[in-house]
């Protein structure tokens, strides 16, 4: 009986130490650095992405604003500072809920897709933006007359870049809510919605979407729908 108690003592002692060490490891894995965000005021923000916003070779955080300006946070002097000064990017009149960045037109620079949603479901008032840069100024590819027939005027929730062929050429999957899913690619310098051709134009309550090597070595898509 005594030997059994000793064994149990050691067993539970080891278990206790493992729990303590695990908790300590978890506690030290992340560090709260919120204090380095300059002007970190309360606001509604639902989306974030990372890209080289100003083509200086460094990446910035792109943070959406839902009724607030979109931000481009750059790490400078030990702080995360908003370096955006362009109205078309901040877009305070829109309610931006998602953002993704990838080189959709194969020019070596990542374009920025802002998913705007001003209604809960179905038809919305303001279309999304696909921002490209020229002479250090952003402009919206969707505002070009040739691209207006493919505007997304459906409420959405999430957006993700997808390399569907595995060749480094990206398309943009837009999870809409109460309307068909969109899948944009650029073909012959025109924005094309390829969702129907790819059998993705389902009408559902699209909530979330992620792309990666989930089941195969190609870029799979996991879509969370209601």
Predicted regions and their residues:
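Bacterial N-terminal signal peptides that target proteins for export
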Residues: 2-13
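Beta-propeller-forming repeat regions
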Residues: 26-226
């Amino acid at each position: 009986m005594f030997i059994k108690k000793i064994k149990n003592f050691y067993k539970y002692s080891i278990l206790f130490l493992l729990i303590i060490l695990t908790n300590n490891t978890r506690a030290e894995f992340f560090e709260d650095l919120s204090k380095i965000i300059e002007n970190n005021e309360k606001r509604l923000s639902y989306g974030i992405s990372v890209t080289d916003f100003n083509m200086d070779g460094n990446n910035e955080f792109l943070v959406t604003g839902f009724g607030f300006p979109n931000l481009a946070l750059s790490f400078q002097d030990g702080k995360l500072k908003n370096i955006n000064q362009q109205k078309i990017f901040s877009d305070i009149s829109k309610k931006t809920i998602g953002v993704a960045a990838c080189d959709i037109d194969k020019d070596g620079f990542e374009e920025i897709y802002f998913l705007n949603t001003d209604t809960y479901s179905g038809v919305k008032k303001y279309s999304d933006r696909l921002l490209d840069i020229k002479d250090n100024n952003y402009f919206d590819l969707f505002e070009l007359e040739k691209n207006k027939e493919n505007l997304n005027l459906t409420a959405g929730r999430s957006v993700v870049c997808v390399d569907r062929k595995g060749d480094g050429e990206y398309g943009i999957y837009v999870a809409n809510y109460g309307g068909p899913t969109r899948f944009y690619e650029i073909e012959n310098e025109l924005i094309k919605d390829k969702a129907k051709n790819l059998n993705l134009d389902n009408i559902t309550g699209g909530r979330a979407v992620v792309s990666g090597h989930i089941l195969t070595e190609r870029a799979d898509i996991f879509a969370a729908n209601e």
